[in-house]
């Protein structure tokens, strides 16, 4: 049994806490809101984020970082914009080096850093053993019901990756290892952009043909940028690429899909986030990916079209028309060029 802290008591943080508790680990779940922590400890529920799910007594909630000083592993499950502050706060409380597993999906606008890079920047080197990413098609609602789910873990250290695989894996939660840290993080982050686009086209009244086109061409965009950043193209055919893309673009559980649908129906980005009452990672990631694409001179037309809707005020139907009216191309044109560049490197 290990002492594990999970920072973030939303739906995904709570669901991962359940997996760890099922595996016999003692879990300290750090919540931002006092009422959430109290409910978990007293009523053993988290109705705000995971309605009707019983939380075992082996999960103890707190709002104080001071209560995680004795942990061996920290699972970080907070929005990308909160990563730096959350990690920075650990510098004053940790007593020894820890492994940080992050289950967040995003890229930081401006710096264009992946989450593992942000963690490495903020945590004192003497307090960090390794950063591991956990990603894949894994809706919290289904994980909490113990429905069969598969995910991928990756880090710079294969031995550490295997340790985290053992930490989480059970009969309902199957964990694969992957040595492509960049690819796993990029796939998990960028699929939120494509989910927004799929939801947007649904809001416009378009059907399955459009959704299939967005998903397929969206995966090509993810691959182009990912490979340029050093990822393996094979990773995007796996759980953290295609797998996560499918589940996020087709499920009612997907907040990015639902946000996109609202955009397609005419709501502004601000109205969407206010209506949902939670962070929509795909909005910030669209900004970061658009900036990266321009910097690296990579064509990402779906991302660019979505950026024009989110940040330039373009009407969704006009963005869709422009996307369809682009100059004709070979299906594998840009992806082939990027893969060739990687081989030459």
Curated annotation (Swiss-Prot):
An example Gene Ontology CC term for this record: cytosol
Reaction(s) this enzyme catalyzes, per UniProt: sn-glycerol 3-phosphate + NAD(+) = dihydroxyacetone phosphate + NADH + H(+); sn-glycerol 3-phosphate + NADP(+) = dihydroxyacetone phosphate + NADPH + H(+)
Residues engaged in binding sn-glycerol 3-phosphate: 105, 136, 138, 191, 244, 254-256
UniProt keyword annotation of Lyase present: no
Entry keywords, A to Z: Cytoplasm, Lipid biosynthesis, Lipid metabolism, NAD, NADP, Nucleotide-binding, Oxidoreductase, Phospholipid biosynthesis, Phospholipid metabolism
SUPFAM superfamilies (UniProt xref): 6-phosphogluconate dehydrogenase C-terminal domain-like (SSF48179), NAD(P)-binding Rossmann-fold domains (SSF51735)
Cross-referenced Pfam families: NAD_Gly3P_dh_C, NAD_Gly3P_dh_N
Binding site for NADPH: 11-12, 32-33, 105, 140, 255, 279, 281
GO terms for MF: glycerol-3-phosphate dehydrogenase [NAD(P)+] activity; NAD binding
Keyword Hydrolase attributed: no
UniProt similarity note: Belongs to the NAD-dependent glycerol-3-phosphate dehydrogenase family.
Identification of the protein by name: Glycerol-3-phosphate dehydrogenase [NAD(P)+]
Protein species of origin: Halalkalibacterium halodurans (strain ATCC BAA-125 / DSM 18197 / FERM 7344 / JCM 9153 / C-125)
């Amino acid at each position: 049994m290990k002492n594990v802290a999970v920072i973030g008591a939303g739906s995904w943080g709570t669901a991962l806490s359940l997996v760890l508790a099922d595996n016999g680990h003692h879990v300290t779940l750090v919540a931002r809101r006092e009422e959430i922590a109290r409910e978990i400890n007293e009523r053993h529920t988290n109705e705000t984020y995971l309605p009707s799910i019983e939380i075992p007594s082996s999960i103890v909630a707190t709002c104080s970082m001071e209560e995680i000083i004795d942990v061996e592993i920290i699972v970080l499950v907070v929005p990308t914009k909160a990563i730096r502050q959350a990690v920075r706060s650990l510098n004053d409380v940790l007593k020894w080096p820890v492994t940080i597993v992050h289950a967040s999906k995003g890229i930081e606008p401006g710096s264009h850093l992946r989450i593992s890079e942000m963690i490495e920047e903020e945590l004192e080197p003497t307090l960090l053993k390794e950063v591991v990413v956990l990603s894949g098609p894994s809706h919290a609602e289904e994980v909490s019901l113990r429905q069969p789910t598969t995910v991928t873990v990756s880090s710079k250290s294969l031995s550490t990756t295997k340790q985290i695989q053992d930490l989480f894996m059970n009969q309902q939660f199957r964990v694969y290892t992957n040595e492509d840290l960049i690819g796993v993080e990029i796939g998990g982050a960028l699929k939120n952009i494509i989910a927004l686009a799929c939801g947007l086209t649904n809001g416009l009244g378009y059907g399955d043909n459009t959704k299939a086109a967005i998903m397929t061409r969206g995966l090509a965009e993810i691959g182009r940028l990912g490979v340029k950043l050093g990822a393996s193209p094979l990773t995007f055919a796996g759980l953290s690429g295609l797998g996560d893309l499918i589940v996020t673009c087709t499920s009612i559980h997907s907040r990015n899909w639902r946000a996109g649908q609202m955009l397609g129906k005419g709501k502004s980005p601000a109205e969407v986030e206010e209506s949902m009452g939670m962070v929509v990672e795909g909005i910030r990631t669209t900004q970061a990916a658009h900036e990266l694409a321009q910097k690296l001179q990579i064509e990402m037309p779906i991302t660019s079209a979505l950026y024009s809707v989110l940040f330039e005020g373009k009407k969704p139907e006009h963005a869709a028309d422009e996307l369809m009216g682009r100059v004709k191309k070979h299906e594998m044109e840009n992806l082939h060029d990027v893969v060739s560049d990687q081989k030459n490197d």
